[in-house]
């Protein structure tokens, strides 16, 4: 794997882990913030809202070199996860989670462009899949590791490690990812012209309903494994490894 793709995969790992780690540590977070588990689910929603809002960065940052955007996204992830680690009240954690979600969608769009551009001829798809593998690894290993840390030590440590990882990723992106030119500017209207065809709307609907179903299950996976399934808290990380493995197999 090229070092540049490895650097991008590192960023994908951070964002994948930051998105899903809250599912595994929801009970501990709810206790620390003195809220109910359903109310703590808003920390997951705040991240999702950040993802939606953050995609606008690509719309208004279309003239910025992609490498600079990746560095910006990792800096935002650094701030968001640092704030999550030190949050002392529920509103602060909500804001921190919103900030953490801002770079998510925009990162994958930009990283895909870079991965395709830097790939050897005929290996564009492989290059992109290797970049996305960072998020897959986060689902299978990163999230269970965060759950284990929360159970053994503190849920704050999971976010602190992600913040440190974001800082490291900024360094390797600066060092390993070459600069490429921004994509040809088609204007704001041009970026949405594809929506005049029915095909993209069908894809968007499929993604919407598919992700809605996954998040309905995944958001409260830790509480229902313990309270409904009867599993002990120490078994949750191992069960989440199996869930992550299922995602990997499903993706294949």
What function would you assign to each model-found segment?
Residues 96-134:
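Cytoplasmic helix-loop-helix junction between adjacent transmembrane helices
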Residues 201-240:
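Extracytoplasmic gate region of multi-pass secondary transporters
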Residues 34, 86-92, 230:
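Helix-breaking motifs and short loop linkers at transmembrane-helix boundaries and internal kinks
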Residues 47-49, 136-137, 241-245:
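Short hydrophobic/small-residue motifs within alpha-helical transmembrane segments
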């Amino acid at each position: 794997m090229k070092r540049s793709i490895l650097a991008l995969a590192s960023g994908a790992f951070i964002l994948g882990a930051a998105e899903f780690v809250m599912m595994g540590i929801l009970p501990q977070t709810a206790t620390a913030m003195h809220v109910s588990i359903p109310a703590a689910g808003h920390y997951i929603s705040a991240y999702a809202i950040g993802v939606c809002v953050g995609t606008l960065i690509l719309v208004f940052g279309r003239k910025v070199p992609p490498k600079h955007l990746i560095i910006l996204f990792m800096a935002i992830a650094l701030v968001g996860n640092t704030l999550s680690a030190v949050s002392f009240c529920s509103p602060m954690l909500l804001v921190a989670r919103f900030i953490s979600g801002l770079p998510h969608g925009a990162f994958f769009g930009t990283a895909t462009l870079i991965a395709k551009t830097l790939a050897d001829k005929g290996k564009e798809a492989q290059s992109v899949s290797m970049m996305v593998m960072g998020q897959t690894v986060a689902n299978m290993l990163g999230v269970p590791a965060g759950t284990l840390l929360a159970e053994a030590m503190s849920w704050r440590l999971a976010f602190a490690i992600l913040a440190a990882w974001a800082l490291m990723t900024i360094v390797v992106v600066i060092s390993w990812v070459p600069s490429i030119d921004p994509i040809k500017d088609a204007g704001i209207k041009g970026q949405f012209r594809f929506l005049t065809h029915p095909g993209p709307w069908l894809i968007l609907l499929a993604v919407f309903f598919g992700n809605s179903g996954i998040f309905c299950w995944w958001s409260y996976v830790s509480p229902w494994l313990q309270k409904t399934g009867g599993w002990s808290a120490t078994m949750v990380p191992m069960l989440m490894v199996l869930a992550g493995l299922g995602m990997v197999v499903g993706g294949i």
